Amino acid sequence: MVEKLDRRGFIMVSLGAVVLLDSQFLSCGGKNDMTAFLYSDIYLRHLTGDGHPEKPERLTSIYNRLNQSEWYGDLTLIRPESANLDVISLVHSHDYIETVRKECEAGYTSLSTGDTVICGESYAVALEAAGGVCSAVDAVFEEKAKNAFCAVRPPGHHATPDRGMGFCVFNNVAIAARYAQRKYNAERVLIADWDVHHGNGTQDTFYTDGSVFFMSTHQSPLYPGTGKIEETGAGDGEGATMNRPFPAGAGNSEIIGAFRDDLLPAARAFRPDFTLISAGFDSRVDDPLGSFEVDDDGFRELTEIMLEIAHVSGGGRLVSVLEGGYNIEGIARAAEAHVDELFKA
């Protein structure tokens, strides 16, 4: 049932997804050199309760701000599609996937595996989040877009292969990396995480795998307590993990410096075919869950560095996936700065 038209005249359905008929992509500008944007009201159905910081308003704030940007009409919009279990199983164990499904259906209010609030629709929404990010991967590899930003929830970087924690259900960025490797034969994938919290789930997924380079800047000490500088990978993955923990108060100089001086040379040596960002905007100066002081200009410069990395050997293919960020106005401003740089690339 059609409810309304958005300001560009695209038909919106009750779930908030753009009607795209036979295509999962809709290009406003009709070119393949545009930035893709993934958002749907489906992601608002993961309900966390009053007072919880990981709330639906995080996404609506981003959408409303981007929708007022002068370049919004030139973005390529992506319709989310639910990930099938084969895709989720690229990262997560069958037992864990079943735990999430059964506990959501049974009316649990939080996952038994960790501190992640759930509701009856959380399993379905998490499948849509992971599937939407995979649709963004399709967009850049099939040259429907040059890069993409995915405003999804629940977030994912704390989810390990067999455990949900830290507000996360399925690890969207890890699934996207494995999906790119399986479907598009990406031999080397680089993931950079600038969330204020360490991406322990992503690190765990690839710790012994040299085909995925993972780098994280994060506040320490802070939840989840992982990500020491000495954690550099093991076995075949030795040297493919890079952690740069910083104390409270770190800002543009420290975080940008780690990306420019440490990650960029490593990326040139690694030569990724595909680049992913875990874009956590809780490293912003005003976030209630962290004590970093990165500002919007800082996120612009971080984005520029990541775009440079994406062009090292991957033809610019880059997908950015929302993680944290809990100041409702701050997350929108940071996301706008980030997407503006993606768009200008």
Residue ranges of each PLM-predicted region?
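HDAC/HDAC-like amidohydrolase catalytic core signature
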Residues: 2-345
